[in-house]
């Protein structure tokens, strides 16, 4: 995982946060899933995203390890909506600069809050009933004429508009892959890191 969102500049996109240090949001899941990336980059699976979000803390509900969304002083630990209609308790109404909150133990920022993140995993309410028997990832690339239920993709991490529940590393929800939302972004992964053949 890259600590910030990474895309390919040659295609007219950027490979860094905007000039105010905020994460970028992009249109449509399809654009994020391969059409803008060189083959080495892709969206993470839901399992890969959760592994990275936990930062080595296997049973922790949040990337920072604790069971609460606030520290001992009462400060929020991510950019999310702590109470009904309360978007500015952390001093930002929408997306915050990337380094506004501490990274997890892998050095990854905003694995909870700020913007939710697309995964490559297709959303189905019953996926946990069969996915572990078959494979840890459930992928389906919807066709244009497929029904809306087949166009759902898992998003993880919660955003500035979500309550703390959606910021938990084990919480999943969905969005339709052909929609654009100001509160959903992505981070890319590389399929292989290491040396080539000698």
What do these predicted regions represent?
Residues 15-16:
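Short beta-strand "wing" residues that participate in macromolecule-binding interfaces
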Residues 182-197:
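Short, structured beta-strand segments at or near domain termini in extracellular proteins/domains
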Residues 1-7:
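Short amphipathic alpha-helical interaction segments
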Residues 10, 20-169, 195-198:
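Functional-site microenvironments in short loops/helix caps that host divalent-cation chemistry
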């Amino acid at each position: 995982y890259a600590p910030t969102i990474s895309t390919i500049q040659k295609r007219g996109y950027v490979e860094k946060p905007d000039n105010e240090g905020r994460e970028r949001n992009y249109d449509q899941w399809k654009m994020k899933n391969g059409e803008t990336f060189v083959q080495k980059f892709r969206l993470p699976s839901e399992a890969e995203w959760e592994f990275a979000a936990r930062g080595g803390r296997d049973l922790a509900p949040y990337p920072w390890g604790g069971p609460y969304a606030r520290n001992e002083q009462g400060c929020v630990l991510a950019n999310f909506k702590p109470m009904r209609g309360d978007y500015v308790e952390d001093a930002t109404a929408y997306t915050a600069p990337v380094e506004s909150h501490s990274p997890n133990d892998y050095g990854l920022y905003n694995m909870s809050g700020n913007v939710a993140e697309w995964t490559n995993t297709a959303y189905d309410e019953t996926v946990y009933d069969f996915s572990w028997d078959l494979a840890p990832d459930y992928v389906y690339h919807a066709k244009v004429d497929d029904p809306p239920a087949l166009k759902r993709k898992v998003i993880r991490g919660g955003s500035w508009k979500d309550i703390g529940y959606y910021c938990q590393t084990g919480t999943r929800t969905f969005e339709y892959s052909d929609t654009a939302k100001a509160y959903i972004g992505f981070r890319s992964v590389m399929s292989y890191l290491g040396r080539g053949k000698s």
